[in-house]
């Protein structure tokens, strides 16, 4: 493993350096080959570095700026008027080859716009997509994309998302021939809108993609497929609904286990299993959505992420950088396009 540099928007998210800096310190303790460039207000960042070990601080660089992209900023406004923002400067470090990946918990639309303009998309890719990993009943990861970067998509864009999702599953999880499905209102070929039906027809013609057909919402967590593709409108609602249900289940389980002497006693006996279950159900365990299809690695964290959740997003960014995800997607897409045109 070689040394790796991560550019981190220290000011992004609901809590800024209060979360991003402690998570950075934890990540550096876990990975001795990692260096992190914290981009943001140096005075605020330094407040959270006072007690850090000297050996850890030696692997931190601070790039000072006081400008921040507000959560209320529209993407075009941020692109034109936030040229010295912590988010933009972090992305520029990736563009300039000074970092191998970028992470931000800030404004999603601004992150998408800046990343696309500064890093450009890969050959054959029209739009980047936000993708995240979801749990499944058989403990295998399921990738869902797009999560909101593209509210509406034509069939060609959905096809490109399917290719990128397949390569992501192969690269990050070493899944052999990942099963890819299109999220739809039914599994029959006549179901769904024109875009989804046409995307299905395109995927059926590509033997390199293990396309299994349509999948309905109740099968997302079944583990029957490895990659699920949809437009950003559907994907974002699906993800947020899932996170809400997961938090409800965790709350109800904790409440139930606290009622009655014998229930509390039983809960203590099986505490390790309960902790494992709660961890699997906790959305923070899966924090970090990748903006794939770019000539560089950009990861988006939840704005409300706590330290543990933000650390998870850092780990994701490092993993993708180590496995050279953009290059893997580009190589695979080039191979598929050559076969189509031959």
Swiss-Prot record:
Q: By its UniProt entry, which InterPro entries does this protein fall under?
A: FA_synthesis, Phospholipid_synth_PlsX-like
Q: Which domain of life is it from?
A: Bacteria
- Give the UniProt subcellular location, in the record's own words: Cytoplasm
Q: What EC class is this?
A: transferase
Gene Ontology MF: a single term: phosphate:acyl-[acyl carrier protein] acyltransferase activity
Catalysed reactions listed for this entry: a fatty acyl-[ACP] + phosphate = an acyl phosphate + holo-[ACP]
Q: Which GO terms describe its cellular component?
A: cytoplasm
A GO biological-process term:
fatty acid biosynthetic process
Keywords of the record? Cytoplasm, Lipid biosynthesis, Lipid metabolism, Phospholipid biosynthesis, Phospholipid metabolism, Transferase
Q: In which pathway does it act?
A: Lipid metabolism; phospholipid metabolism
**Which residues form each disulfide bond in the chain?**
none
Q: What is its main location?
A: cytoplasm
Q: SUPFAM superfamilies from the xrefs?
A: Isocitrate/Isopropylmalate dehydrogenase-like
EC number(s) stated in the UniProt entry for this protein? 2.3.1.274
Q: Does the keyword Protein biosynthesis apply?
A: no
Q: Its function? A: Catalyzes the reversible formation of acyl-phosphate (acyl-PO(4)) from acyl-[acyl-carrier-protein] (acyl-ACP). This enzyme utilizes acyl-ACP as fatty acyl donor, but not acyl-CoA.
Family classification: Belongs to the PlsX family.
The entry describes its oligomerization and partners as:
Homodimer. Probably interacts with PlsY.
Name the chain's protein: Phosphate acyltransferase
Q: Which organism is it from?
A: Shewanella halifaxensis (strain HAW-EB4)
This chain is encoded by the gene named plsX
